[in-house]
């Protein structure tokens, strides 16, 4: 397959369904956007807590609160498939809304500025921001399925996986340095500004010709979206249960649990060992995590695309 350019087009149409390069660039950018809070809460905050002397139990609590919303993605999926503003496309209103909530929460928590020993508040911060991120993630998954033709699925999948990892890399490296030099509030603000950039792009593009850019703009729902929109909850529930408990889905369950357990343990153990045994600071851990994630992201795109 011919490799797609990741540069945002300037003179071509801003409709995702009509512009291949824009489609693929947007998929990459949106998945990178959801990696931004993950880099902060999976890597930088645990490292910051460990450097400040927090216990493994406290770090585990924050990591667990970060992961809880990701266990309930199906709820977000139900809501998006049932309710949306079709005149803006099936997914854009949810993506824009979720990212605005992410930005607002990060700004609020930058003002509140909980310390490394404020474990309950940090856990609630992680829970709130990641809940918004889950809605963004599910909406982007849906957008990817809606707009990518079959021949672009391989490249789209590589850009999705690699984009998220690169977003984590940028976030982990940047926020690790920000926390070390300026404090945690600066890291929250840095993440919020990165999400702002992604949000501006999503507001600029549209899914299909004739749709609205914003809720108050001129435009109308397209027939392909009207036909795809679910009118009742029951078919959605039946389809979700059928797919969840299919033989293929259940066969992946032990693998996913094993990967999740390993990942969670590493999120707690690595900062504890790095700070306790080697005396590393937040910026050093951020550089390590950022570099590792960047290499993984580039490799994913190169191999998968």
Which residues are covered by each model-predicted region?
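Symmetry-related core transmembrane helices of the 12-TM Major Facilitator Superfamily/SLC fold
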Residues: 97-104, 185-204
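Pair of pore-lining "gating" transmembrane helices in MFS-fold secondary transporters
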Residues: 14-52, 127, 245-266
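Juxtamembrane intracellular "pre-TM" segments in multi-pass secondary transporters
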Residues: 5-21, 209-251
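Glycine-rich segments within core transmembrane alpha-helices of 12-TM secondary carriers
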Residues: 69-73, 154-179
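C-terminal ends and interior cores of transmembrane alpha-helices
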Residues: 95-117
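Transmembrane alpha-helices of Major Facilitator/SLC transporters
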Residues: 68-76, 287-305
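A membrane-interface helix-boundary motif in multi-pass transporters
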Residues: 88-95, 118, 177-194
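Short amphipathic helix-loop junctions that connect adjacent transmembrane helices
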Residues: 37, 43-58, 268-286
């Amino acid at each position: 397959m011919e490799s797609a350019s990741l540069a945002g087009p300037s003179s071509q149409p801003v409709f995702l369904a009509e512009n291949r390069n824009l489609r693929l660039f947007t998929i990459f950018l949106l998945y990178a956007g959801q990696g931004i809070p993950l880099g902060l809460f999976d890597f930088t905050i645990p490292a910051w807590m460990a450097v400040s002397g927090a216990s493994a139990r406290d770090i585990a609590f924050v990591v667990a609160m970060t992961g809880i919303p990701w266990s309930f993605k199906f709820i977000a999926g139900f809501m998006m498939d049932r309710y949306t503003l079709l005149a803006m496309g099936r997914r854009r209103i949810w993506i824009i809304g979720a990212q605005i909530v992410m930005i607002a929460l990060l700004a609020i928590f930058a003002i509140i500025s909980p310390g490394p020993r404020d474990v309950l508040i940090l856990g609630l911060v992680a829970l709130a921001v990641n809940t918004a991120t889950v809605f963004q993630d599910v909406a982007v998954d849906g957008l990817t399925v809606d707009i990518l033709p079959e021949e672009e699925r391989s490249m789209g999948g590589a850009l999705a996986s690699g984009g998220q990892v690169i977003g984590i890399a940028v976030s982990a490296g940047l926020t690790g340095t920000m926390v070390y030099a300026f404090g945690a509030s600066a890291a929250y603000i840095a993440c919020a500004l990165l999400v702002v950039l992604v949000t501006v792009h999503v507001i600029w593009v549209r899914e299909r010709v004739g749709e609205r850019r914003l809720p108050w703009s001129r435009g109308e729902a397209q027939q392909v979206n009207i036909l795809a929109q679910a009118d009742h909850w029951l078919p959605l529930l039946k389809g979700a249960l059928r797919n969840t408990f299919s033989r293929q889905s259940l066969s992946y369950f032990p693998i996913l649990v094993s990967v999740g357990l390993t990942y969670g343990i590493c999120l707690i153990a690595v900062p504890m060992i790095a700070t306790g045994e080697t005396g590393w600071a937040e910026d050093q851990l951020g550089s390590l995590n950022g570099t590792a994630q960047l290499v993984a992201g580039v490799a994913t795109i190169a191999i998968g695309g």
